[in-house]
Regions:
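Acidic, metal-coordinating helix/loop segments flanking the phosphotransfer/catalytic sites
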Residues: 34-50, 58-60
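As written
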Residues: 97-108
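Conserved acidic carboxylate
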Residues: 7-9
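Conserved phosphotransfer cores of two-component systems
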Residues: 44-46, 71-79, 104
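Two-component signal transduction core modules
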Residues: 51, 82, 109-110
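C-terminal output helix
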Residues: 112-124
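Conserved phosphotransfer microenvironments
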Residues: 51-76, 86-97
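Two-component/phosphorelay signaling modules centered on CheY-like receiver
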Residues: 11-36
Length: 127
């Protein structure tokens, strides 16, 4: 069973992603983090295969803050893949930071808000 933790700013988007992943992936368990402050603890407790976090231009979802969470999760949770989710239509600079993090091996994958549900689920399933 693939375990996935979602750390998404909007509860509506998080629950939509949860439902979509449960429909698209055969065997997965999705946990929604209550807040960025709780994500590291959720990862320690649930030992996920994937941590998906959205990245925004404001706190507490800023790129730097997400990388700090990634660092803590990497130290405490073996084999957890980190995927960043970014709205590629609104902030080109932020999108480039996320791309660069992938190039440097800091994250395992990234997704744009404009991708299809099938592609979204396939990327999460493939890491």
């Amino acid at each position: 069973m693939k375990k996935i933790i979602l750390d998404i700013q909007s509860d509506i988007h998080a629950h939509t992603m949860e439902r979509m992943l449960m429909q698209k992936l055969d065997d997965c368990h999705v946990v929604i983090s209550e807040s960025p402050d709780a994500t590291v603890e959720w990862c320690k407790t649930h030992r996920p295969d994937v941590l998906l976090m959205d990245v925004k231009a404001y706190s507490p979802w800023m790129f730097k803050e997400r990388m700090a969470i990634r660092d803590k999760v990497e130290r405490n949770t073996e084999n957890c893949r980190v995927i960043l989710f970014v709205d590629d239509d609104t902030d080109g600079e932020l999108t480039e930071k996320v791309r660069q993090a992938k190039r440097e091996g800091l994250i395992d994958a990234f997704l744009f808000g404009s991708v299809s549900e099938n592609y979204f689920a396939s990327v999460i399933d493939s890491v």
